[in-house]
């Protein structure tokens, strides 16, 4: 068992209140910026996904909130 190593997962990054970062252009760099600023390897705009059009991050650290089932409370 390794200590001091954080695990990561691929997921929708969440704003406060369980809302996704909305996006509208699959080729924009917006989501990659949001994801990498939060420690992910990369990110992109997932169109028509489970929670609509939202930023999907690759290898997002476990300490960063992700979109979970339930309502987005704006």
UniProtKB/Swiss-Prot annotation:
Expressed by the venom gland. GO terms for cellular component: extracellular region. It comes from Mesobuthus eupeus. It comes from the Eukaryota. Alpha toxins bind voltage-independently at site-3 of sodium channels (Nav) and inhibit the inactivation of the activated channels, thereby blocking neuronal transmission. Residues 9-73 form the LCN-type CS-alpha/beta domain. Keywords: Disulfide bond, Ion channel impairing toxin, Neurotoxin, Secreted, Signal, Toxin, Voltage-gated sodium channel impairing toxin. The keyword Iron-sulfur does not apply. GO terms for molecular function: sodium channel inhibitor activity; toxin activity. Has the structural arrangement of an alpha-helix connected to antiparallel beta-sheets by disulfide bonds (CS-alpha/beta). Residues 74 form a propeptide. InterPro entries: LCN-type_CS_alpha_beta_dom, Scorpion_toxin-like, Scorpion_toxin-like_sf, Scorpion_toxinL, Scorpion_toxinL/defensin. One of its GO terms (biological process) is defense response. The keyword Signal applies. Residues 1-7 form the signal peptide. Its main location: secreted. This is Sodium channel neurotoxin MeuNaTxalpha-11. Belongs to the long (4 C-C) scorpion toxin superfamily. Sodium channel inhibitor family. Alpha subfamily. Pfam families: Toxin_3.
């Amino acid at each position: 068992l390794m200590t001091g190593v954080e695990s990561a997962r691929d997921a929708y990054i969440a704003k406060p209140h369980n809302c996704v970062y909305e996006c509208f252009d699959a080729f924009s760099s917006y989501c990659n910026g949001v994801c990498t600023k939060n420690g992910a390897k990369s990110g992109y705009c997932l169109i028509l996904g489970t929670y609509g059009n939202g930023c999907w991050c690759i290898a997002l650290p476990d300490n960063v909130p992700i979109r979970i089932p339930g309502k987005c409370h704006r």
